């Protein structure tokens, strides 16, 4: 017997653990300039089925203000892996706010950097008890409040009747007690999305046992399809960091050759965003996401420059 689709959509809000999402899906990929709203609205949520306590299929609708609560923390320059990490993260946060004003709310915790004493593993006897190992002083970097903020916000929105359907994007078991309380005190449906772009990290059982549904990965095709525009317009345009492209070093080589020809960096990027008949109709800006594609663009530019030098 076919289950009946209830006519009243579930008011849905998404809660994203930004730290967990970055390390699970985005680190080391060309997809960091990610547009979160269409990723969930057009890809993730349409792929799942939500049922109520009676087994009826329920439609959903994203709340408008906000649709997504994104929990993050500003990178500290002294521990950043790259020289532009701080400015690149700031650009991304600005882009989300500008493009989706009101629909994505950024809620910030902070990073704490402290010196602490730790025991090091004995290389000659890795199984030696920690109490017998040598002690050294080391830096400890911790993100603070993001998981607590997510748990509190999800519970608050549920207990105050703001949502019917809470989608939790994390694989952090610290969130599990909040989900348990939501299940115990409300009828809110809970979904858990594990932020990993591969299928090699399974969902934590302590987390998903409180979920009504789960999705255990986000594939690279979905991430690629949901990239922000390269330039977000405004009084001061927000531009995708060049280090966030798939092949930043090759991109720089391309720009070094293209800028003198086109006259400016902006003009060079404008050329790269147009389909190129000499590159099988593909756009150079998309080709530079892979080493093979970027090499094709470089070869074309070198060939074009050589031809120009041979002209009388």
From Swiss-Prot:
Superkingdom of this protein's organism: Bacteria
Disrupted-gene phenotype: Cells lacking this gene are still able to grow in nicotine medium.
Domain NYN: residue ranges: 14-210
One BP term from GO: alkaloid metabolic process
Recorded metabolic or biological pathway in which this protein acts: Alkaloid degradation; nicotine degradation
Pfam family, one: Xre_MbcA_ParS_C
One GO MF term attached to the UniProt entry: RNA nuclease activity
Reaction catalysis annotation: 4-(6-hydroxypyridin-3-yl)-4-oxobutanoate + 2 NADH + O2 + 2 H(+) = 2,5-dihydroxypyridine + succinate semialdehyde + 2 NAD(+) + H2O
Keyword annotations: Alkaloid metabolism, Monooxygenase, NAD, Oxidoreductase
EC number(s) from the headed UniProt entry: 1.14.13.163
Function: Involved in the nicotine degradation. Catalyzes the cleavage of 6-hydroxy-3-succinoylpyridine (HSP) by incorporation of oxygen at the 3-position to produce to 2,5-dihydroxypyridine (DHP) and succinic semialdehyde.
Comment field (misc): The catalytic efficiency of HspA is lower than that of HspB.
UniProt-recorded name of the protein: 6-hydroxy-3-succinoylpyridine 3-monooxygenase HspA
